[in-house]
């Protein structure tokens, strides 16, 4: 079982949980405040970060995509969590796309630094 240790998962609060879709997951194990979760396959919009501290620019680029900055001008619902992969030489921010979409249904991003990726089922460590 692969565990993605370098992924920081930013979890939404209770108020967002009622209005924002989250990927389905099952709890595998809890170790103190850390949960090992098995997530199903998803699609992510991703953008590189200039550094591991540049999350606001990445968030703006991804928000631009879901708020109509795409080849159809279509708005896409916000989901949770927002992900940051904090590998020093290649940090990335990602938004999970709503489950109603397939890769064929999603409009292409207008911003060349935003790309779409199929993410297979995976195990993630999350701070609960």
Map each language-model feature to its residues.
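Sec-dependent N-terminal signal peptides
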Residues: 3-12
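A solvent-exposed interaction/effector surface
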Residues: 13-128
């Amino acid at each position: 079982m692969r565990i993605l240790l370098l992924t920081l998962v930013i979890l939404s609060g209770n108020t967002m949980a009622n209005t924002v879709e989250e990927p389905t997951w099952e709890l595998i194990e809890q170790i103190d405040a850390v949960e090992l979760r098995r997530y199903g396959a998803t699609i992510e919009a991703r953008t590189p970060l200039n550094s591991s501290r540049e999350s606001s620019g990445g968030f703006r680029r991804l928000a631009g995509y879901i708020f109509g900055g795409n080849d159809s001008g279509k708005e896409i619902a916000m989901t949770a969590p927002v992900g940051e992969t904090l590998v020093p030489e290649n940090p990335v921010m990602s938004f999970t796309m709503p489950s109603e979409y397939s890769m064929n249904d999603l409009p292409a991003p207008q911003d060349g630094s935003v790309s779409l990726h199929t993410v297979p089922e995976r195990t993630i460590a999350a701070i609960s």
